[in-house]
A protein has these predicted regions:
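N-terminal secretory signal peptides and thylakoid transit peptides that target proteins
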Residues: 1-16
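A generic secondary-structure signal for well-formed alpha-helical elements
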Residues: 12, 16-20, 56, 63, ...
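C-terminal segment of N-terminal export signals and the immediately downstream linker at the start
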Residues: 19-54, 226-228, 234-235, 243
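Non-heme iron-sulfur electron-transfer modules
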Residues: 25-32, 61-107, 134-147, 162-180, ...
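Cysteine-centered iron-sulfur cluster-binding motifs in ferredoxin-type domains/subunits
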Residues: 42-58, 62, 108-131, 140-161, ...
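Long, compositionally biased charged/polar accessory segments in the mid-to-C-terminal portions
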Residues: 189-243
């Protein structure tokens, strides 16, 4: 998309209006939902993930994700004793239908679900020329597709590879932590479908949230901490080879 300076200046006020609308609450939120009382994130408990693909399928069904694109996906890592820093990583069709049988050889296998990291200091929001993507007051990175130009600047800026341009709508799309669900007191589709509890939604502003306590008592990590994005997807027992 070719964006002239005049085009951007014309669109910026409408994007600001969109932000005020979202800040006040959207039709997707429950009437009594208070954005400022929450700060959403997620825990991925790697030892519990069995690579079944339930989360990927549930996400695609819940959010009408087009074939070949993913708001969340699962990777399988194979770390061998001979090369512990360069694992084999596969994710056939996003792990949607599971994985082939592991080879009977040395090393270890484990699964790593990935999704938007809901960064508090998100690179994607900083490069959007019209403010169509933003961090909501409750900590979820959203895209107002009415104002998105489809320029893909945000797709290129995301260090986690979590965005794509919708092939039909021609606008940016990504995981929203099932915003239409969590603002009504429900959990995300991926968390609800996980048979082992490997994925857990967490309200970081709620000290009584059991996952909040887990984060304080376990050595959890975020992906690519050197990027200093304020990522809020936390991984328990994250192997150093994960990239």
């Amino acid at each position: 998309v070719n964006l002239s300076r005049r085009h951007i200046l014309v669109l910026l006020p409408t994007a600001a209006i969109a932000w005020k609308f979202v800040e006040a609450g959207t039709p997707e939120t429950a009437p009594n939902y208070n954005m400022s009382s929450h700060w959403w994130g997620m825990l991925i408990d790697i030892p519990k993930c069995i690579g079944c693909g339930n989360c990927v399928r549930a996400c695609q069904a819940e959010n009408d994700v087009p074939d070949g694109f993913f708001r969340t996906w699962v990777e399988r890592y194979h770390v061998t004793d001979t090369d512990m820093t360069n694992p084999e990583v596969i994710s056939p069709d996003g792990g949607k239908e599971g994985f082939p049988a592991a080879a009977e050889d040395a090393g270890k296998y484990f699964f790593v679900p990935k999704l938007c990291n809901q960064c508090a200091d998100s690179p994607c929001t900083q490069v959007c020329p019209v403010g169509a993507t933003f961090v909501s007051p409750d900590g979820v990175v959203l895209v107002d597709q009415k104002y998105c130009l489809g320029c893909a600047y945000c797709v290129q800026a995301c260090p986690y590879g979590c965005r794509y341009i919708h092939p039909e709508k021609k606008v940016a799309d990504k995981c929203t932590l099932c915003y239409h669900r969590i603002t009504k007191g429900l959990t995300t589709a991926c968390c609800e479908s996980c048979p082992t509890g490997a994925r857990q939604l967490v309200d970081l502003k709620n000290p009584s949230d059991p996952i909040h306590a887990f984060l304080k008592t376990h050595s959890v990590h975020v992906l690519k901490p050197q990027m200093a994005t304020g990522a809020k997807v936390y991984y328990n027992e994250l192997d150093g080879s994960v990239r």
